[in-house]
């Protein structure tokens, strides 16, 4: 069963990352690094969910209105909950690696910009094929990673980036069948994208769409402005 096999593989990845995180957090850092930062966790989850949903919704709605995207039915592939659990494990493990212990450790000694460069290089090492999807696809993937770094910096927690990353992956991959996380490509809705490649995204679908690129860029601007405002207020205080 492909769904179970992927769940098992992602479960192993998650277990390894959880052990790595807890080991270094407790044995090396003696719990001095706040990775999860559960204070205001409801707020963190809420910000994360909105950040993950926004680019999908703001891309799908215009495409549906101008009929570049058409709905043609429901795909009853089965094992939906197992696929969702696999996405959950994959996302949590990825966030523990990219914006968990390493992000907090580097951020303790360096500024946000160099830490983001390091995390982006690590992200590229995990996804070496993103440039094969074209310029817009690569830009969307890199901006998505940058948004999550901004989110981690803004909330000082891995919880918000995880929530954003999970809901985005669940919607784009499992619901709309756009983002390719698994070779089997499970999806719930049968959608057809047609017309101008800049809008339809071509083979990359939503992640290859210029509307998605604009949405990701606006999210980056929003969090950069929020961080600047917070820094200004802290200096005044």
PLM features: residue spans?
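Alpha-helical transmembrane segments and their helix-entry boundary regions
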Residues: 44-48, 101, 115-116, 158-162, ...
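Hydrophobic/aromatic residues in alpha-helical transmembrane segments
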Residues: 20, 58, 89, 98, ...
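Function-critical hydrophobic alpha-helical transmembrane segments in multi-pass membrane proteins
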Residues: 74-133
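Specific transmembrane helices
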Residues: 1-91, 176-234
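Aromatic-anchored segments of alpha-helical transmembrane domains
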Residues: 56-62, 120-129, 166-175
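Functionally important transmembrane alpha-helices
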Residues: 137-197
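Residue-level signature of the transmembrane alpha-helical core
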Residues: 11, 49, 53, 84, ...
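Helix-capping/transition residues at the boundaries of transmembrane alpha-helices
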Residues: 63, 103, 107, 152-153
């Amino acid at each position: 069963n492909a769904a179970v096999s992927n769940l098992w593989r992602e479960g192993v990845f998650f277990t390894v990352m959880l052990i790595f995180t807890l080991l270094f957090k407790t044995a090396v850092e003696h719990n001095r690094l706040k990775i999860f930062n559960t204070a205001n966790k409801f707020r963190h989850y809420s910000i994360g969910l909105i950040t993950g949903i926004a680019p999908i919704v703001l891309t799908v709605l215009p495409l549906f209105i101008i009929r570049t995207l058409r709905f043609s039915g429901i795909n009853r592939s089965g094992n939906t909950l197992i696929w969702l659990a696999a996405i959950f494990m994959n996302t949590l493990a990825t966030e523990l690696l990219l914006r968990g212990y390493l992000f907090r450790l580097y951020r303790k000694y360096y500024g946000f910009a160099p830490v983001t460069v390091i995390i982006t290089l690590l992200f590229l090492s995990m996804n070496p094929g993103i440039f094969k999807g074209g310029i817009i696809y690569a830009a969307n993937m890199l901006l998505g990673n940058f948004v999550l770094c901004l989110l981690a910096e803004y909330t000082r927690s891995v919880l918000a980036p995880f929530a954003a990353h999970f809901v985005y992956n669940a919607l784009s991959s499992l619901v709309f069948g756009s983002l390719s996380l698994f070779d089997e490509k499970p999806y719930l809705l049968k959608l057809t994208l047609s017309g101008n490649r800049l809008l339809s995204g071509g083979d990359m679908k939503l992640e290859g769409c210029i509307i998605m690129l604009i949405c990701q860029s606006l999210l980056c601007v929003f969090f950069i402005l929020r961080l600047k405002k917070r820094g200004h207020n802290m200096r005044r205080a």
